[in-house]
Amino acid sequence: MRNFLDKIGEEALVVEDEVSTSFEAASILREHPRDLVILKNLKESDIPVISGLCNTREKIALSLNCRVHEITHRIVEAMENPTPISSVGGLDGYRSGRADLSELPILRHYRRDGGPYITAGVIFARDPDTGVRNASIHRMMVIGDDRLAVRIVPRHLYTYLQKAEERGEDLEIAIAIGMDPATLLATTTSIPIDADEMEVANTFHEGELELVRCEGVDMEVPPAEIILEGRILCGVREREGPFVDLTDTYDVVRDEPVISLERMHIRKDAMYHAILPAGFEHRLLQGLPQEPRIYRAVKNTVPTVRNVVLTEGGCCWLHAAVSIKKQTEGDGKNVIMAALAAHPSLKHVVVVDEDIDVLDPEEIEYAIATRVKGDDDILIVPGARGSSLDPAALPDGTTTKVGVDATAPLASAEKFQRVSRSE
């Protein structure tokens, strides 16, 4: 993380005033949604809070050494060309001891939150059968000085825990908090269960990513600001939530697995990374890695796809814009169907020509305004499975999905040519 802070060259908003981890800190973060914020003086902890490392596409592009419109292609490249880790070090430079969450400035963000939440913690675990390492970011609610309730959706970590519980065993884990944006982004990618997110991160780092070996668990993790070691307990569940999710609304309360922590390692002059729930950092980290998934699915249908964006107005989750070089009539509708299938949470998708910048909401609106004929170009799919994060979805989880083909007809393409782009 420190190398990225040196690289970014951005003057952080540094708050010297004493603030509380309960609501006050989060209130400051909400007031500065695009800034890199450092809270130096927390009432409850000697460790400063940093937030906003990944709250713009520009910062993410900088961490990936690419331009903003190349982010999707850069992620696809790393997912398809992972680089094995060759360097593992020790915990030099850390102070180690018994895990005690009361030492950390873990924020309580909103009034109805179930408790303080770790929001930038990456859980590292191994497949009990194969030993393959998995890294994934999860929200974790504090329920004791050494215990967390963790939200685990049915993906890779969920499968690992199932395997361990079938054996009657706990699942060993490490939690890393405070790493560089490229490594953090890699932990959110959708790769096969037998692949390693750290090898994706290593490709982002041109093969130069070094991990550190934990003391009490069989795990190697990035050299994060804070590293916790422990176990997800076999068969133990606690109530988790409420928690404010992507849509700025409360997620439901569930019975979720429990983590018991044993060891804690803190770097000298550590900073605690906090992601504001429903803020841009939360939305980009969760949504942006789905763009390559949509891109690859669309490319199988229409090879001339140019870019895919999950828009910020759609919480980087529910709305997508896709640009293509249209070859035949019907390409737009095929893209709509491919995109909806690739990302089941997607609710509305707009397909535009390659002259439209999908990163610019005004450009997308322009395409809809000038190239859409409602009775021909809008595809409506009622009764489709939607997102659990969509407050408008029905109790059974279904919703109505909409696709808008905002591409110009090929037969009269000249009529739609934009003068400002051609003369």
Curated annotation (Swiss-Prot):
Reactions catalysed according to its record: (2E)-3-methyl-5-phosphooxypent-2-enoate + H(+) = isopentenyl phosphate + CO2
SUPFAM superfamilies: FMN-binding split barrel, UbiD C-terminal domain-like
Keyword NAD annotated: no
UniProt enzyme class: lyase
Residues that, per the record, bind Mn(2+): 134, 197
Cross-referenced Gene3D superfamilies: UbiD C-terminal domain-like (3.40.1670.10)
Function: Catalyzes the conversion of trans-anhydromevalonate 5-phosphate (tAHMP) into isopentenyl phosphate. Involved in the archaeal mevalonate (MVA) pathway, which provides fundamental precursors for isoprenoid biosynthesis, such as isopentenyl diphosphate (IPP) and dimethylallyl diphosphate (DMAPP).
Protein name (record): Anhydromevalonate phosphate decarboxylase
Organism: Methanothermobacter thermautotrophicus (strain ATCC 29096 / DSM 1053 / JCM 10044 / NBRC 100330 / Delta H) (Methanobacterium thermoautotrophicum)
